[in-house]
Amino acid sequence: INYYPENEYILFTNSALCNLKNDFSHELENKKLNLIYFECPVIRDVNESYVGIYSKFWLSIQLRSYALSIINADIILITSFFDGFRDNTLVSHDNTFKLPPIVSIIYDLIPLNHSDQYLNVDPEYKLFYLNKVKELSNLDALFSISESSRQEAAKYLDIDPKFIYNISSGCDERKFSLITPNSNIDSKFLGRFLLYCGATDPRKNLYRLIEAYASLPLDLIIKHKLVLTGPYTHEETILIKEWMITFGLPPEYVVFL
């Protein structure tokens, strides 16, 4: 939006969720940007057990699809297609409406590739996820965050690979800067370190990272602390510390930020 301010952008949001105006206040108040905030009406509590015709879910999809059909957009971008399990998030649409091309960002298909770990343990989520996979295959195009996710989508989804584009979500060095003097992180105390930024869910493989780090020669561990940034809940921190005990990793070499 900052690179192409001459275009018109509509932030199409869900009235059943939190108001996002404060999160985008800078962009909305910037008169150089042509950004419109729109809350699409939905029928509350869309996740009732019945989702067929005339259900709250069905009616909300009709409202959403109608709104999308009249905003005269050139393209609709969905930033996360797998949201909406047991909450009021709504990303589905009805193709009987005259809609512009619809594309979605795709991050991974890990639950599909590891169904025993993610899907088979929860039949309700499995049904939700597989329906999303089917819907995803009916979109006009996909934007993958990496070449790996592009290949994964081409392999497992029923969509022409030529409509899957790798947009790469690598970090932009212009967004980062050196630690400021008033930072509460004591870099001298850390010394040299290995940094892990992520959650504790199985797909992140933090358990194996702890195991691998603990298996390093002691002189390397002493010289390179392992720094973990979550944030983590109290329960997750306890779990990580249990892994450290399992692999005989002294707590002084692991730093939680």
Q: What do these predicted regions represent?
A:
Residues 1-257:
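Carbohydrate transferase catalytic cores enriched for Leloir-type hexosyltransferases
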